[in-house]
Amino acid sequence: MRQALPAGSTVSVLGADGSGASTLARALAIRLQARHVTVLDDTPLRHAIDRELRLGDRSLHDDALNAHRRHACTLLVGLDAHADAQCERTDALLRAALAGAGLPFAVIHGQGGERLANALRALGLEAPEAPRRIAPFDCDKCSDPVCEHRL
């Protein structure tokens, strides 16, 4: 596990269209607001990848990657099993750009609360566990919840 994210950091959340990156970024921004952490899902790197996909133009990559180096952490939202070819290509280009520039990233999988918990763990912030409810004791001999049969 990585060290806890320092206050004032910037986290980028990247992913193909429809991957849930924007939804995760919003949830993280709310969760990390008290730490004064900025969460971005609309980054120069994502724009550079989009331009490469549409026009085959990689001219924005160097500047985008240099800007991205200032981010404390990059979370890449993993694709689900039913991703289309365009999403797979976007994901592959994002991974290649980050890896090629030597920028570390964590791939985040899951849905909803599970995805948020996985992202928090990747940032070195454990998601609080849901409170456990202990089933009330119900004695089948006397129906008294505090009887000696409980022992």
Please provide the spans of the model-predicted regions:
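Extreme N-terminal, non-catalytic leader segments
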Residues: 1-12
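C-terminal accessory "lid"/substrate-recognition subdomains
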Residues: 2, 106, 113, 120-151
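Hydrophobic/aromatic beta-strand patches that form the interior of the parallel beta-sheet core
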Residues: 11, 73-75, 106-108
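Glycine-rich phosphate-binding P-loop
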Residues: 11-30
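Post-Walker A helix-loop "phosphate-sensing" segment adjacent to the P-loop in P-loop NTPases
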Residues: 30-38
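Conserved beta-strand segments of alpha/beta enzyme cores
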Residues: 38, 104-106
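ATP-dependent NMP and nucleoside kinases share a basic, alpha-helical "lid"
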Residues: 42-101
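A short acidic, often aromatic-flanked loop/helix-cap motif at beta-alpha or helix-coil junctions
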Residues: 45-48, 111-117
